Amino acid sequence: MPITSLSDYDAPDRILFPKRSNGALVNEQAALDALVDLLDLEVIEVNIFRGISPDENRQRVFGGQVAGQALVAAARTVDHGNIHSLHAYFLRPGDPLVPILYEVDRIRDGKSFTTRRVVAIQHGKAIFNMQASFHHDEPGLEHQLDIPIVPSPLTLPDFRTRMTPYKDQIGAWYDQPRPIDTRYIGRMPVERVGSQEPFQRVWLKAAGTLPDDPVLHACILTYASDMTLLDTTMLPHGMTFWDGRVQMASLDHAMWFHRPFRADGWLLYDQHTPSTSNSRGLAYGSIYTQDGRLVVSVVQEGLIRVTA
């Protein structure tokens, strides 16, 4: 059952997910714990929550953070059922220096489905909105596409190892602990030269262990799903986000949650792009567990603006 109220734990007001007391955490686990804290929200009033951004040198808030926090806000108001779909629009760049208010509209509480609308606000203006739908578990027909045949994530180097040749170019970012472990199958974007096929595959997982709460796992994967996907839209053009001529930003994001999963287990993010045009790129993602279950489908459109 989703955690929907602060009374579920004997903890301070900002706690949604249980904390660990182990002080000997490795860097990645500490980074993951910091992400869990980031996704926790302060209750301001009924249906109103406040989130913060990490103390990082960013010009704007990472879109996955806003989407993950918005899903937390929606889930806080739902008594029963699990998230089965969300549809979101990124309206304005988020300011990382000020908190984000999340206002939840309880659209519908039905017998099988519950619908919520969430608006994220900064400086008196909406920067993001999301519609999320929750569904009671219900038996029915089952089918899915098979997982592609790919190398095991344990045979692939992690992100930091792959980026070692470029560490002088990226500076302090290279040494920063990462809450999400990403392992590319084949070349990473920075390693590619010339036009490529319009698809890529990435293994990802939370870089540590998480509590069992399914709301938390859905929110962590929502955060992570905004990573790497738009890369595919530039593969046919021989360009990457490292190119100084390219401006990239998420415009909208949709997810469908098909089956249970753990975000701290390996997940294959199978990605492809059908089209890029009018300075917008569209990308699809299918997310599989390591044992082959299709658990989430993702579609994202992004701004892909190239300057001369």
What are these regions (language model features)?
Residues P2-A308:
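Terminal targeting signals and extreme-terminal segments of soluble enzymes
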